[in-house]
Amino acid sequence: MDGKNCSSVNEFLLVGISNKPGVKVTLFITFLIVYLIILVANLGMIILIRMDSQLHTPMYFFLSHLSFSDARYSTAVGPRMLVGFIAKNKSIPFYSCAMQWLVFCTFVDSECLLLAVMAFDRYKAISHPLLYTVSMSSRVCSLLMAGVYLVGIMDASVNTILTFRLCFCESNVINHFFCDVPPLLLLSCSDTQVNELVIFTIFGFIELITLSGLFVSYCYIILAVRKINSAEGRFKAFSTCTSHLTAVAIFQGTMLFMYFRPSSSYSLDQDKIISLFYSLVIPMLNPLIYSLRNKDVKEALKKLKNKKWFH
């Protein structure tokens, strides 16, 4: 494209979820409640794990980082979306838009890989229980998390640089409630083929690593569970994985549908609904899944409830 037609954009206008005045108040109250639940539940989970020594294990170390990722990427999107319901000015500065996407992408990618790491942790706990604390030492856990966050930051940085160096010369109106890449690519008047190829390749690689890790880990888990003689022992061993499997099914199902659906079926309205689900609904569900189905967490909550805070 001719460079003289490429004018700089200082801000974008976020259309939001709905422009209907009668619906805005209802949506604002609904998503304010959802966002508060996300903060209370995920930060509460982190605090609970830190306070209860019984939860100072690799499994709950990774769970605390899952809660941190949920709280972080939902916070990148939630407050700005809530402001959009009540503010007349729906603009977001160019660099704020870039930062929003950078933070969001970093922690979504991190959560994607973290779910595979958590499956590996379950494999170690079930297949090699006697060596579990040695093989999953605090140093190993910290290195795994460092790798997870490093990949997330690298992918998000590449995505952000490639997207926000494009030309936006015809319109600055984003038909979305946050600065997501697909609507930005549609908005650009530059050739976006390289962006689409790089984004698809990197995210596809991350998904391949994640799904391969999940598949291999659970194959070994199933083999280990089958070797347990008693039915009660098999049930107890596999029950530790049910919360994780539920979280994986919801998160990965949404991600795969979002980024690997046929281009012919793509629509921005559908995109907004799916984005809403994985940016706010999933972070609300994860702590509920892990607390309602987890005996250790429920026991820790009970101890916290019965603790005498004032003497």
Swiss-Prot record:
Which positions, given as ranges, span the membrane?
26-49, 58-79, 101-120, 140-158, 197-219, 237-260, 273-292
The cross-references to InterPro entries, in alphabetical order and at most eight, read: GPCR_Rhodpsn (IPR000276), GPCR_Rhodpsn_7TM (IPR017452), Olfact_rcpt (IPR000725)
The record places the following residue ranges in the Extracellular compartment, namely 1-25, 80-100, 159-196, 261-272
Annotated glycan sites: N5
Gene Ontology CC terms: plasma membrane
Q: Which UniProt keywords apply?
A: Cell membrane, G-protein coupled receptor, Glycoprotein, Membrane, Olfaction, Receptor, Sensory transduction, Transducer, Transmembrane, Transmembrane helix
* Any matching Pfam family: 7tm_4
Residues on the Cytoplasmic side?
50-57, 121-139, 220-236, 293-311
The protein's topology relative to the membrane is:
Multi-pass membrane protein
Q: Which PROSITE patterns match?
A: G_PROTEIN_RECEP_F1_1, G_PROTEIN_RECEP_F1_2
- Which Gene Ontology MF annotations are present? G protein-coupled receptor activity; odorant binding; olfactory receptor activity
Checking PANTHER family in the record gives: OLFACTORY RECEPTOR
What role does this protein play?
Answer: Putative odorant or sperm cell receptor.
The UniProt family comment states:
Belongs to the G-protein coupled receptor 1 family.
Which protein, by its recorded name, is this? Olfactory receptor-like protein OLF2
